[in-house]
């Protein structure tokens, strides 16, 4: 007889998995935090208030969400659901957590460079970091430099949904270094042995504010840019000195077409280090500079409390939250 299953979350992840779950389990209840859904049906199941979860007889609970699973997991445990009843999400599975621990234990340097893709970044900079054998985080379309440089990142990260969708095949083809993705990108990018999943403490549905930084990969704070997430990952890994390079913090998108709220259509913007970075017609998310700046301030305060230095080694740009030291001075 199939075991009795409770499901938390009734969004797109449930729609994707419901038929498979029906075959494998006896579904006894579906729960969601959206009070407007309570009492309504989805996929033939009545949606209930999570506060009533212990009134249902179930053996296991599955979180059907690829966002804020850390919050949901903590919520159901607080409601009295035994931890051992919760089916681990990709973020919380033992294998993923072990990968994070292994990387932290393998770190053998105190300094790391976090490389933004701003126009100030040059191939000469990347080659210099390569020749100096520096630990580096890089992001998104950094692979555009690979044909012209021997530089390869120590760690690669992507978190933006449109970046992942637009470049999934190229990102999936990247190998030779760990790749960090948030849980929600598992809908878009392939899982492989070199992929590590991180969780994010996302704000309200409109993404109107930054969230508190964390050094735990299950619950990184959100600052509307992958750079903020990488700083937190670097802190988790144990780096005590973090240099930013190519983080110009100076976007211009007045010439772009607006597709929908906060989504632009590329018309030749030149905010990045490579001429082919933004092909015409590509959709991209407009930066939320005020949110990012507020998160940089939170990160500076967070890092100072735990004895970590964040230094801006970008050539020029408009980011003045962190003290500046030139790349040449840093490598001298």
Question: Model-found features: residue ranges?
Answer:
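Hydrophobic, helix-prone linear segments
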Residues: 1-6, 52-54, 234
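A short beta-strand-loop structural module common to alpha/beta enzyme folds
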Residues: 28-35, 137-141
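Metal-ion/cofactor- or nucleotide/acyl-coenzyme-handling active-site neighborhoods
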Residues: 71-332
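Phosphate-bearing ligand-interacting subdomains
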Residues: 35-95
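Core-facing hydrophobic residues within beta-strands of well-ordered domains
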Residues: 25-27, 153
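Glycine-rich adenosine-cofactor-binding loop
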Residues: 2-21, 30, 116
């Amino acid at each position: 007889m199939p075991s009795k299953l409770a499901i938390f979350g009734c969004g797109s992840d449930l729609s994707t998995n419901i038929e498979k779950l029906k075959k494998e389990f006896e579904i006894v209840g579906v729960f969601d935090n959206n009070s407007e859904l309570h009492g309504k049906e989805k996929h033939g199941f009545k949606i209930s208030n999570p506060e009533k979860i212990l009134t249902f007889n179930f053996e296991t609970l599955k979180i059907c969400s690829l966002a804020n699973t850390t919050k949901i997991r903590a919520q159901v445990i607080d409601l009295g659901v035994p931890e051992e009843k919760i089916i681990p999400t990709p973020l919380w599975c033992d294998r993923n957590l072990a990968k994070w621990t292994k990387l932290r234990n393998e770190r053998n340097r105190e300094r790391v460079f976090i490389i933004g893709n701003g126009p100030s970044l040059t191939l000469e900079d990347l080659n210099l970091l390569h020749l100096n054998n520096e630990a580096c985080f890089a992001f998104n379309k950094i692979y555009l430099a690979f044909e012209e440089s021997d530089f390869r990142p120590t760690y690669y990260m992507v978190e933006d949904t449109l970046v992942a969708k637009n470049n999934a095949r190229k990102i999936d083809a990247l190998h030779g270094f760990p790749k960090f993705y948030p849980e929600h990108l598992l809908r878009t990018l392939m899982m492989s042995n070199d992929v590590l999943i991180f969780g994010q403490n996302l704000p309200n549905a409109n993404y109107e504010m930054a969230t508190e930084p964390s050094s735990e990969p299950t619950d990184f704070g959100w600052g509307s840019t992958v750079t903020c997430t990488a700083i937190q990952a670097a802190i988790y890994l144990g780096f005590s000195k973090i240099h930013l390079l190519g983080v110009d913090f100076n976007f211009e998108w007045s010439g772009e077409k607006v597709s929908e709220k906060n989504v632009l259509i590329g018309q030749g913007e030149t905010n990045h280090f490579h001429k082919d970075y933004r092909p015409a017609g590509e959709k991209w998310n407009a930066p939320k500079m005020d949110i990012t700046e507020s998160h940089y301030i939170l990160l500076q305060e967070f890092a100072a409390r735990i004895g970590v230095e964040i230094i801006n080694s970008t050539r020029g740009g408009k980011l003045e939250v962190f003290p500046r030291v030139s790349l040449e001075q840093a490598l001298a």
